[in-house]
Structures are given as C-alpha cells and as structure tokens.
C-alpha cells in the first residue's frame, strides 16, 4: 500500500511475501504508459495525433485495406474509438498481432463508438518502437529518467517481439506511484516539464461517454 498526499509519501506497506522491489504484472495500466509514450513522441514532432495510423505501417497494410481502417487516426486509437469492436489479435493469436489490427474486418467507422480494444494500445506500442528505435519501456525510462523507474521493470513482448503496450508492463508499486505523480502534476517534475501539460489534461479528461 502506498499513499502519497501533499507531495509526501505518508504510508508505505508491503505484506508477505511481497517486498518493495517485487515486480507485478500491471496488465491494463500498461495502456496509460503507452499513451504517455505517444505524447512524448508528439512533443518531439515525430507524429501528430491526427495522423492516419496506416501511414506508419505500410508493411502491414493489405492492398485492399478497408476504408474505415484507412481513415483511423492515432487519436481514435488513444480514445478507444477505433473501427474494431474487440481485440483483433485474439481472433488468431498465432498471426502477427500488429498486422491483425489492419486486416481483421472492422465493424463500424472509427471515431464514433467506444469499444475496449487492447489491440489498439498494442499497435500504438509498436508505433512507439518504430519511431523511437528502442523498446517502449526503455524509451520511457530515458525520456522520464528524472522519475527513477526501477531498473528491473520490463515489458512483456508478443510472439513477434513487440512490447505488449496493452497489458505487458511488469513493475513495482513505487514505479506506479512515480507515474501517477507525473500525471497529477501534469508532466512537471522537479521544475522540469517532461511532457506537455495540455496532452496530460486531454488524456485524463472525460472525452467519450461509455453508456
């Protein structure tokens, strides 16, 4: 248990057999890390949230790509308003997980309806790795080095070597607290703006009704 209040760690407790350095698979918290990595790349000018995702994966796109997939943007994916109603790679987990995002038939136009879609975050993690030239968590540790993420933390990969940006983060509770601190302070840490505050405000706001 970690409780941080008024910029102070007021409670920290671990229960056997767990220790402060015990790594836990964080599953869907991974998606938030992927979002921040995308925000960092946007700050670097390496992408725009309104870019069509297919422009970054020409090697994964079929010749007869569906127009709904062709129109889907990075912003649609971050908001989980893609053209898929479910996680695409679960259709056949032996096929290329990223490629499935572009080949599984869509169910509706992107940007319209919220559907929880882990393949969206997974494909965004692949995008981070393409544009940064390194594993996604390594990129985050480098860009956010002032936070001091644990050296032992890592990201699981799919069978094709892509970081599982939707569910693969394996880290300590303190790593999550440091990440939460970054968000709560809108990217400002020790007087340094690590990530644009506008991105964090948008990412943590209520953008899509789900009911």
Positions of PLM-derived features:
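Non-transmembrane alpha-helical segments in soluble domains
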Residues: 39, 54, 75-78, 102, ...
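Active-site SXXK
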Residues: 7, 25-50, 77, 124-128, ...
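Short, solvent-exposed loop/turn and secondary-structure capping segments
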Residues: 88-91
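Active-site helix/loop module of the DD-peptidase/beta-lactamase fold
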Residues: 25, 44-82, 103, 132-167, ...
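Aromatic- and histidine-enriched alpha-helix N-cap/loop-to-helix transition segments
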Residues: 27-33, 69-72, 114-122, 170-174
């Amino acid at each position: 248990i970690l409780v941080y209040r008024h910029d102070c760690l007021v409670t920290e407790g671990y229960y056997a057999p767990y220790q402060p350095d015990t790594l836990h698979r964080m599953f869907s918290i991974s998606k938030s890390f992927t979002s921040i990595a995308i925000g960092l790349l946007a700050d670097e000018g390496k992408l725009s949230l309104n870019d069509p995702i297919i422009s970054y994966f020409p090697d994964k796109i079929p010749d007869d790509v569906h127009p709904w997939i062709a129109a889907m943007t990075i912003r649609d994916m971050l908001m989980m308003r893609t053209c898929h109603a479910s996680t695409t790679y679960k259709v056949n987990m032996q096929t290329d997980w990223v490629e499935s995002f572009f080949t599984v038939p869509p169910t509706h136009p992107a940007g319209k309806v919220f559907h929880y879609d882990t393949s969206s975050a997974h494909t965004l993690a692949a995008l981070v790795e393409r544009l940064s030239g390194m594993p996604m968590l390594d990129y985050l540790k480098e860009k956010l080095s002032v936070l001091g993420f644990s050296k032992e933390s890592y990201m699981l990969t799919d069978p094709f070597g892509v970081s599982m940006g939707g569910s693969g983060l394996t880290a300590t509770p303190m790593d999550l607290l440091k990440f939460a601190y970054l968000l709560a302070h809108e990217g400002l840490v020790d007087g340094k703006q690590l990530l644009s505050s506008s991105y964090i405000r948008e990412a943590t706001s209520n953008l899509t009704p789900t009911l």
